[in-house]
């Protein structure tokens, strides 16, 4: 399957998270994105070094600037279960704007065409690192990394697209 690209309509799918009452919720991507300007970024794994020390902190630090440019939601997805994503989100007490969503079986990652095979590293199927700018379901920017790189999908890169 070809990776998601500029001009594509973001596919719908289900992701999971824990709400403020600590209840497990399943949500459709379209319900989060329709009619809004959204950043959807994906990482290979929660608690992994580049994801935890660079990618996520960049979006947390730049959230105010992104929101000032019309972004209404900043969504982080990873091929992890919702319990892991909840724990990872809690490791960023300063975070007020980034929502952490689980794609436990990589179903949504597959729908985006962004799977990354990390079986030889013991991690199974994961997501390529990426950042999408989506406006009312239409992809306006698709910054997709090759392999495990971190060169085009940062918050600063998305800011240039706004």
Curated annotation (Swiss-Prot):
The keyword Oxidoreductase applies. It holds the Pfam family Redoxin. SUPFAM superfamilies: Thioredoxin-like (SSF52833). The keyword Repressor does not apply. Residues 4-162 form the Thioredoxin domain. Changing residue 129 to Q: Reduces catalytic activity to less than 4%. InterPro entries: PRX5-like, Redoxin, Thioredoxin-like_sf, Thioredoxin_domain. Thiol-specific peroxidase that catalyzes the reduction of hydrogen peroxide and organic hydroperoxides to water and alcohols, respectively. Can reduce H(2)O(2) and short chain organic, fatty acid, and phospholipid hydroperoxides. Plays a role in cell protection against oxidative stress by detoxifying peroxides. Belongs to the peroxiredoxin family. Prx5 subfamily. This is Peroxiredoxin-2.
